[in-house]
């Protein structure tokens, strides 16, 4: 006997994807996440494709995963998807040391971040 299915935390017209352990500070990742919040999924993909930020490649991969989840797992229309949420969280922080003068050492922090993207299917307003 298997366990009963867990109740879905998102509404039926939403799908999500999570990217963890992204090697960038949450502050820098949030700059790229702000570009796509509230945009149509196709426009957000185009923005990320031409962004000059290094982390935009990973954000684009996560957005493509959210779109694929919406299409394959939840049978949503890809052309009607909008990025409803793109929020950034802190991950772990690796601490490294670098030699300094007079026998001392300095700390270097190497932060990681997490990204959650939620896409929602919107009904087109008939004009």
Curated annotation (Swiss-Prot):
Family according to the record: Belongs to the universal ribosomal protein uL22 family.
PANTHER family from the UniProt entry: CHLOROPLAST 50S RIBOSOMAL PROTEIN L22-RELATED (PTHR13501), LARGE RIBOSOMAL SUBUNIT PROTEIN UL22M (PTHR13501:SF8)
GO CC, alphabetical: cytosolic large ribosomal subunit
InterPro entries: Ribosomal_uL22 (IPR001063), Ribosomal_uL22_bac/chlpt-type (IPR005727), Ribosomal_uL22_bac/org-type (IPR047867), Ribosomal_uL22_sf (IPR036394)
Function: This protein binds specifically to 23S rRNA; its binding is stimulated by other ribosomal proteins, e.g. L4, L17, and L20. It is important during the early stages of 50S assembly. It makes multiple contacts with different domains of the 23S rRNA in the assembled 50S subunit and ribosome. The globular domain of the protein is located near the polypeptide exit tunnel on the outside of the subunit, while an extended beta-hairpin is found that lines the wall of the exit tunnel in the center of the 70S ribosome.
Record has Transport as a keyword: no
Full protein name: Large ribosomal subunit protein uL22
Keyword vocabulary terms for this entry: Ribonucleoprotein, Ribosomal protein, RNA-binding, rRNA-binding
Complex formation: Part of the 50S ribosomal subunit.
MF terms in GO: rRNA binding; structural constituent of ribosome
GO process annotations (BP): translation
């Amino acid at each position: 006997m298997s366990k009963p299915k867990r109740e879905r935390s998102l509404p039926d017209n939403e799908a999500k994807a999570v990217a963890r352990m992204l090697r960038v500070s949450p502050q820098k990742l949030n700059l790229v996440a702000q570009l796509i919040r509230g945009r149509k999924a196709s426009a957000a993909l185009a923005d990320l494709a031409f962004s000059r930020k290094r982390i935009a490649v990973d954000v684009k991969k996560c957005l493509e995963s959210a779109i694929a989840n919406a299409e394959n797992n939840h049978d949503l229309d890809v052309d009607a998807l909008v990025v409803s949420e793109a929020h950034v969280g802190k991950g772990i922080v690796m601490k490294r040391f670098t030699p300094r003068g007079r026998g001392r050492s300095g700390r270097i922090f190497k932060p990681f971040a997490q990204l959650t993207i939620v896409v929602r299917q919107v009904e087109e307003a008939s004009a």
